[in-house]
Swiss-Prot record:
Function noted in UniProt: May be involved in photosynthetic membrane biogenesis.
GO biological process, one term: photosystem II assembly
Nucleus among keywords: no
Organism: Synechococcus sp. (strain CC9605)
Keywords tagged on the record: Coiled coil
Similarity annotation: Belongs to the THF1 family.
PANTHER family on file: PROTEIN THYLAKOID FORMATION 1, CHLOROPLASTIC (PTHR34793:SF1)
Gene name as annotated: thf1
A Pfam entry, by short name: ThylakoidFormat
Designated name of the protein: Protein Thf1
Coiled coil (UniProt feature): 182-213
Any one of the GO CC terms: plasma membrane-derived thylakoid photosystem II
Length: 215
């Protein structure tokens, strides 16, 4: 990506790649990720490593739940990535591969495996890396009793330093991610309930009209 590209340029490229109306509930997600990826793409010390790939996909998938039409979500992700010089297909491939590899690993082997994906010394940290770490820990603990969010955040913090991640920021970023995820789930549930209620009202009106017509 050209160093001279501005946020306005990135937004223009995004809207060209994704010329669809985005519902207000999801517009903020798109705007925030677009700006975040733009800033990272201009950070000379940033490297789109494995933890970043997993984290970006996790954040997008978490906050895109309930998006309609669902068929547009892949195109939305591709547009967010391509408008900032990232390869969506490569990110998705890395995400799927690492999540699959993490499954079933015991704590010790997981720690050794994660060390091979540590942030290089002097590299720029992104909150998406913390989310990526948490996502892999969740995949490994899928069948364990301690797979709740608090335990995962604690485990992420314990592993952070050994992976070159700032411990305090990891805890803060994951706590914020968790609270935002809960709020998004509640918002999506409310929207779906509202849509369902409107659908029921419409069906009742149609039934009443049909009864009046037949009587």
């Amino acid at each position: 990506m050209a160093a001279s590209q501005t946020i306005a340029d990135s937004k223009r490229a995004f809207h060209q790649a994704f010329p669809h109306v985005i519902a207000p509930l999801y517009r903020r997600l798109a705007d925030e990720l677009l700006v975040e990826l733009h800033l990272l793409s201009h950070q000379s010390r940033f490297e789109a490593n494995e933890l970043f790939s997993v984290g970006l996909c996790t954040v997008f998938d978490t906050f895109i739940k309930g998006y309609r039409p669902e068929a547009q979500t892949d195109a939305l992700f591709r547009a967010l990535c391509s408008s900032n010089g990232f390869d969506a297909a490569k990110l998705r491939k890395t995400y799927a591969s690492l999540v699959e590899q993490a499954k079933g690993k015991d704590p010790e082997s997981l720690k050794d495996w994660l060390s091979s994906h540590a942030l290089k010394e002097g590299s720029h940290y992104s909150r998406l890396m913390a989310v990526g770490l948490m996502s892999l820990l969740k995949a490994a603990a899928a069948d364990a009793t301690d797979s709740d969010t608090e335990a995962i955040v604690k485990q992420s913090k314990e592993l952070a330093e050994g992976l070159g991640l700032p411990t305090d920021r990891v805890e803060k970023d994951l706590t914020l991610f968790g609270s935002n995820s809960e709020r998004m789930d509640q918002a999506v549930e409310l929207v779906e309930e509202t849509i369902a209620a409107e659908k029921r009202k419409k069906e009742r009106r149609l039934e009443e009209q049909a009864q009046r017509t037949s009587s």
